[in-house]
Structures are given as C-alpha cells and as structure tokens.
Amino acid sequence: MRMNGMASVLVCAICFFWRVAWPQSRPSVPIILTIQTASHGYAIPGDFSGLGFETASELPNHYGVLGHFFDPSNTQAITVLQNIGVKDIRVGGGTVNGNLNGVHCSASIPTNADIDNLFQFAHAAGVKVIYSLRLLNSTACADPNLAAGDARAASYIWRKYRASLDSFAIGNEPDWHHLHSYPGNIVDPAVYETIPGIAGSAYPSYLADWRYFAKTIMRSVAAATFVDPYTGSYTTLTNTPNPTSGVSWTQQFTEDEKNAKNGVGAPLLVAAAQHHYVGGSPKGTTTQQAIDNMLSRNWVDDTQISTGPEGPETYTPYPWLYRHNLEPVLKDGVPYRMTEANDVLGGVQGASNAYAAALWALDYMHWWAAHGMAGVNFHNNPWIGTDTIVPSPNPCPTTGCGNYHTTPKGYGMKAFDLGGHGYVEPIAISNPNNVNVTAYAVGDARDLYVTVINKTHNSTNDSADAVVTIRPDGFPAASVALMVLTDGDPGNAGLMTAKIGDASIPNDGRWPGQWIALDAEKNGQVIVTVPATTAAVVRIHAARQDAGPIQMNQNGALEIFGIDRHGRIWHNWQKGAAVPNSSLVDWNGWTVLGGGVRSSAAAAVARNLDNTLEMFVPSRTGTVYDNHQITPEGAWSGWADMGASSRGITNLQAANNADGSLSVFGVGADGDLWCASQSAPGVGWSDWTGLRGEQINPGFVVGQNLNGRAEVFGVGRDGDVWNNWQASSGGWSGWNRLPGEAMNPQLAIARNLTGEIFIFGIGITNEDVWYASQKTPGGAWNRWRDLGTDGLNGVKIQPGFVVGQNADGRFEIAGVGSDGKVWHTWVTKSGDWSGWDSLGGVGIHPQLTIDNTADGRMQLFGIGRNKDVWSIWQTNPGGIWSVWSDFGERGMKFYSSQL
C-alpha cells in the first residue's frame, strides 16, 4: 500500500522557498551557507541572554519609579523579561560604589527589604542575579566596616535566595580612573589611581582590596563565587602596568585568580567580566550615522580600533576586543561574560532605541556566542536610549513610571532566544556580491537553527534582498519552519517598531508569534529570501521521533526513564553520542532520581528551549510533580509540586509550544483532559485548565504542528478520535471529531518530512493498524486508511505499538503481536509500506518505547518476560536491526500498565 502524503519523505533534505508580499524594488543577490554539522563549536549556556541594571534601581523611588522597580508585583517588567528570553540580570553599575548621577558618595547601600524585592522579582521572572557589592571606599566617604557590611548582605542573600543567585561581584569598573575622581581628590590610592612615581600601582592595589573583600565574604558564605573584575576599558587605555606594553585588567585578573578556590574547593572565579560599548561615546554622531554604524561591517569585521565609519566616534570592533582581552581568558580555562554592553555609551535617540538595534543586538549576541562568550547583559540604565525595557511615557511623569515594555532591541534578543540554544555549528559563507549579510548556525542532533541577518538598508544605498541557500551537510532534514524579525518596511532601519513571528511582544501575556511552515521540494537544500533589514531564523528539524519516556540530551545522548514497583523514578543515559553507542556497555546504568516522590504511572519527558530535559510524574498522593535538568546533561533540580491533587490527574504527556515553552497534559479523575503550561520557556507554571467538552480516554497523544502550536488527539467515550489544537489567541479550538473507524484508546503520533501530522491506532472492528493524516501542515484531514496485515499471517498487533522515523524521514512502526513477538513495517523508498516482518523478542510487553540515536538510528525498548528492560537497535541508519539485548534492572517499567 502506498502511504498517502508520504512521497515527500523519500529524500533526506528539502528545498523551501519563502516569499513575502512586500513591494520589491531591490536587487536580489545569492548567498550560499554550508554548515558542517559533524563537528560542534562552543555550547551556548542557557543563561546567555541577560540585562544589566544599576544598583540604584534596587532602591525605592529612584528614576521616577514610585516604590520599587524590582517588585514581584511589577508584572509588566516580569512578563517582558520572560517573553524576550532573559535568564540573567546583573545588578551593579556605577551606583554600586555610591556614584549616583555623577555625585560621589550619594547612592545608598540597599537594605534587606530592597534585596527581598529584587530576589522575589527575579524568582517570579525566572532569572538569576549577578549581585554586585560595594568595593570603592574612598577617603571622601570611608566606611571602616564596608567589607563586613558586604559579607552581611552576601550572607543574607545566600541564606534566603541562593536558588536565584548567579554569583557575586565586587565593585564596578575599577580600571576607569575618572569615575573614581571627586572634588578635592588629586590622588587617592583607595580608588586605584596610579600613585605618582609608582608606575603600575593601580591594578595591584585593586587586586589586594578585591582579595580582602572576597575573603571577608567567604568567611560568611564559604561557597561564594564571583564574576569580576568588570573591566570598564575596552581599549588599551587602562592596561596594566601601562597602556603601551601592558594587558587588560580582565586578562591580568584572570591570570591571578584562575586557580583560586572558594571555601568549599570550587573555582572562586566562575567568569571573567568585561564591559563593552562598541561605538564608545557618540559625541556628535547623528541618528542616521549611528544607524549606519550599528549595521556596518566594520564593527563585526575590523581588527583595529578606528573612528567612524561615520561620525566622530571611536569604535572597538569585536575581533579586536576578542583577540586582546578575551581570547587570553579562554586560554586560561575561564569563561567570560560581557556583564555590561551596548551599541554606544548612553545611546543615540532614534538609533539605539530603533529597529536597527534589534538587528545589531541579534548579530552581537550570535557573534560573541560563536567566540565562546558565556553571556551578555545589555545595560538598562534608567531611562536612556540604549535601554531594552522602558516605561511609557518616557521620561516618567510625576505620578510614577508605568507601562513597561520592550524597545526593538528586545526583539533581537527574542530572535536569539528562538535560535540560540545548542552548539555553535561551523558555517562557511559564499557571498560573491559581498552583501552586508551575516549568518550563524546553532544546533544539536535534533534541531538546527540558522539565523540570517540582512543588514543592507536604504541610507547606505546597498539595500538588497538576499536569496540564501542553506546546505546543512550531514544533517537529515525532516521539516523546516521560519521565524521572521522585521519592522514591516524592508530597507528602513529607523522605525521605532518591530515584529517577530508576525506578532508584537506584549507586557501582559504570552508572546503569540508562530513559525511559518515552509513548502517542500526535493533537491537537498533550503532556500529562503531574506529582505533588506530583515532577520530570519530557519529551524531545520531532523527526522527523529520519540515515543515514551525517552528524550535526547543536547550532546546527542539518549536518556530513558522508568519506575520500579515502589514508584521510584530511575533513569539511564548513553555515555555519549559517538557511534557505536547503543549496546549495554555504552550506557551508564540505571540510577534512581531521589527526592521522595513516588510515581503512580509513567513519566512524561520533554525538552526545554535551552535543551534541558524536564520530566513530569503523577504521584501516588494524586498530585503532579516535575523535575528538570539545571544545565543540559547536568544535575537535576529536584521535585516540585505542580498541584492537581484534587483532580487526580494521571497518564501524562508533554509537548513544546511555539515559543519553546512546555505544556503538560493529563486525564483527570473526572474524565476531562487537563493542561498546565509554562508562562515562558523554562519559567513558572500556570494553574491546571480543563479542556472540557469531550471525555478523553487514557492513551491520548500530543503533537506539535510545524507552526509550533500543540495539538492533542484522543479517543472519546464514543470510540471516535477527537482533536483539539492551540488557537492563535492562545486558547484552544475546542474538540473536533476525526470521523471514521472507531479506535482503541492507545494512539501513536508522528510528523512527516513536509510537516503533516499522522495519527495511528488499532481499529475496534478488525483490530488492524489504521492511520489518518493532515492534508497540509496544520490543515484538514484525510480519511482513515487501513495499513493492512501483509506478512502477519493472522497475528494481530496489540495497542501500545510505536511509530519511529528513519534518518531519511521514512516512518517505521514496531508493535507486539498477539503471538508475543515484535513486528515492524516501514515505508519503503518508493513510498509504499513494506508489509510486516518479525523482530523476534518473544515475551515483550505490548507498550514499547522508541527514539533515534544521534546518528539517526532507531533504538527500541521494551519490558521482557523476565521483567528486565530489553533493547534492539538499527546497526546503521535505515538499516538492519541488531539482536535483542538485556539491559537488566528487573522490575523496571515504562508505563503504568506494566506494573
């Protein structure tokens, strides 16, 4: 039988075209991107995206704010942070050392109440805090107990809020001598000026003070870690011991502290901190000159500090700063973070807060991620042109600030969040016309994200549409979708508006944007046209299908979860992604996930946007718990109660939403399907909401349409299959019947190369395997079709079968027959189903689990007659299968029916 709609799965890669109905008066130019996915670059940390705030923002009634800006009731700012993907905030700046609005010794030190507000705000937003403590102790306002006061504050934060603490920092920009000057001060060694006649005395005096403060803090918080020195200069101006032959304070400080340990033996310095305002002080730069500079090649490509390229400003290009200040830090084995950064110091109105800033920020983040940076915090110094979060109106009226929202820069951060999680992938760019376009690739074994930024614009007379051919060598594409960042007027970078995913970023709810499903061709590549002043994030999803409590880690290693007869949760994971990696010796062995939770049924496992795994279990007490990896492949956070004890929710399934956040679904004791969702990727959980209108049996499945929206399928009490999908409004469509054959409640789901969802089930009437498919991605449905019984010789496939996907996208079904053997059938290269064939394995329980290894081979798991876990796998992608192997751990189960 030929599978309806399956002809498109016959190739490993796909060609797509995207056209936008904008007036076209610009030339089109070709660009070819070749991505080598066989080798990975740097892994981008999940907390890469950050903002920075002044310590004075922590205080009440500052910058026009009535009360505290950092307050858990400031839901507008919290929602914006979540929607643009911020995971880290740095609180510090010049005001940490008492300098407010240029007035020395004028800023107060935050109280415990101020600290409470900050960290409660951070917890609500799902961000961690780099918390700066005062270091400057000049003679003008000397405090003999300053270090002890810092230690008390650090101890208070550690005791109450360590879960929301990234690390501590001490002081701010100690190398910037002019910031430490004040009336009457000619030479004050306490502020790290160079003492006349003692060359190079500034840095050693700082280092001695920093070490004294750090040791004082560690006497109260032994496990304290630090991000320092917050070097303010990004030229040679403050190099130590002198500008001519010295090195930056960042490099020297890293050399001095790279081997230092805190009180528990861990590295004291978790990251070296550098500041960077690319364009320096804007001086007399006009708005248009600033836009042209921000989008210029010079900032990205030049290797020398220069003036311009337009206007009088001096800029420090990325390659120069990397080579002179930050590459030496990496060579010392220490991560580095840009804890304060922006386009120009103070900003240029109409440029720094215009759409150009969105493209600049996206480019900046990707360039530095590709060069090993651990993260960036764009400074949000209330309320100036470079800010990402601002009030409206700005400046604030006397009644106080309000209506906090994101400027276009936040849209660039959002685009990075959608395409900046995973490993940096090597990319070669063929650009024969030398068009002002940059491109970056980030991915893992499951998803590849290619970001293309077209910075051509009208004012420089180079406006052009880039026709980009993407060649993901070694990456078998299963489906492709597109996310567009635009201001709606290609070529114009000066507008004050932006959209991403055809939506604005709100401050009062979830971002409603969605991915564009692209049409498929068959010539082995992806083609998109990216208009002038537009960025495109292309998501290429590999042909991989997981069914059951199994997921792939960011490094390509599979991880599988089970429960024992006591309800304890266990996991086992591959030692790595390198082939071979499927046999028993290639796995770490079963380890219990402690914490006291006892599961009553199977775990549901999904992957967050930052590539950490998250697991959900229904407990024996009736509530639902979740547990997530703190970092990809890392330790687990511990169990958190998600509520629902009064609803008796069980039979869980989890899926991703369009923005990368997760939703978890389960059947309640009342027979309704219930859902809880993260408020943003990796952040918080909503209350449980009932998807009422149809009673759904356990055995339902959840899939994700190519546009990113989740869709639920389940068998109702009438035996028909019903579906319910996320609507553009953020709600749900309501239940709709897929008429046809009545089905056993245990369904299976898969998505083909062109993005259509397929639903499989066992028919009630003849007990054959049936399937139905979408006619187009996210569209209407074809009629149910009987898969047939060729080769089964009277054997009936039992409910609990799984649908896998070969590396080239062809579906393969594996199920246990009524004879106790495992049978499989697959789509052939001609598009027909092969007929059923035996995989052996007598005594395997009907409910199976399947996933793909990093190289695309399918690996199947089941519970054998001896109650051990058994596995069988393809010996090469799309090839023959191994023999069954006993993975041990007697009594382990994947599903509640196996208990």
Question: Where are the language model's segments positioned?
Answer:
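Noncatalytic carbohydrate-binding groove/subsite architecture in carbohydrate-active enzymes
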Residues: 147-154, 199-358, 371
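Aromatic/acidic polysaccharide-binding cleft in carbohydrate-active enzymes
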Residues: 338, 342-439, 443-446
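A structural motif
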Residues: 544-899
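Carbohydrate-binding surface patches
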Residues: 432-477, 482-491, 533-539
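Conserved, mostly hydrophobic/aromatic
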Residues: 51, 89, 168, 173, ...
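N-terminal substrate-binding region of glycoside hydrolase catalytic domains
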Residues: 32-156, 163, 169-170, 174-175, ...
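N-terminal signal peptide
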Residues: 14-30
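Acidic, Ser/Thr/Pro-rich beta/coil linker or hinge segments at domain junctions
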Residues: 474-530
